[in-house]
């Protein structure tokens, strides 16, 4: 925040100049972190891949403050001597599904600081972070990914932050009439003729609503629980029983035509980094409800099986992020991360396809 603070940072973080000693200390620090997870394998390549991936999960969020606690808030103001470590690089659409929950297990000591950072961002910009970078809100990606991330910390019982303030931040962020939410509250869903990437936005909002509902239930806020739980079922508007896909629905209640579940046009259709094959499964919070849309477990499981064996061709100007395709299952992209585990709910046999897929 100042030349004086820069000197303090240097004195605290690098009081002397010994490159070899500094490199050795960094090696020891990373070794201690990576040893938090042990695997057994004789495959050196698999071990290297695993620990490289584990390292990547620890690169962000990153500290964004001086050693004396000074930091620049998302409102542009400088805050002095904060009683918590301020963080940034909240790539939440990318991390709330797996990396953020993993952090609660591997780095529980960081959770109070991360939660307090998110609450201060809420106070400074009026909502929880969506995709915060260097103290600035980028509003990148769809949905309200800060909500499930903060809700996870509340529901796992981490302390060091105000749970009532956390709930206020969750609720207010879920009720803001921006980024398609105003349309969602008017129509009950986001119409595809009025908003781009409508299916993706709405289905992510539905998942976030479920997270708000769970915190409301935990805190005894029954009316809010009922409201957000019902709103979390908005995904049902998009399910077409004829094609058995999630499809864009316009403001007149008509499915978008023509329809091609293999097509994905980056930032210019009803989905985000995906297509109907991939987004149809984005209901991890209500799998039984999604099974009901299909008419039962047999039809659901049959469609899920098809996901892994249909053509891997992506039609249209698809994003390169839709990667690692096995059929239309995109192993390399976020909306597919949970998909193989859906078998644990739908499959009735002892040997789950999840085992072989994983």
Where are these regions (language model features)?
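Active-site-adjacent bridging/hinge elements
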Residues: 21-32, 63-89, 117-128, 175-192, ...
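Active-site cavity-forming subdomains of large catalytic enzyme subunits
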Residues: 110-239
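N-terminal leader/propeptide and maturation segments of large enzyme subunits in energy/redox metabolism
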Residues: 9-14, 18, 26-34, 211-215, ...
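Conserved small/polar residues in nucleotide/adenosyl-binding loops
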Residues: 348-354
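Acidic/polar, glycine-enriched structural segments that form the non-catalytic walls/loops
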Residues: 1-86, 120, 127-130, 160, ...
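Catalytic cores of carbohydrate-active enzymes
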Residues: 218-336
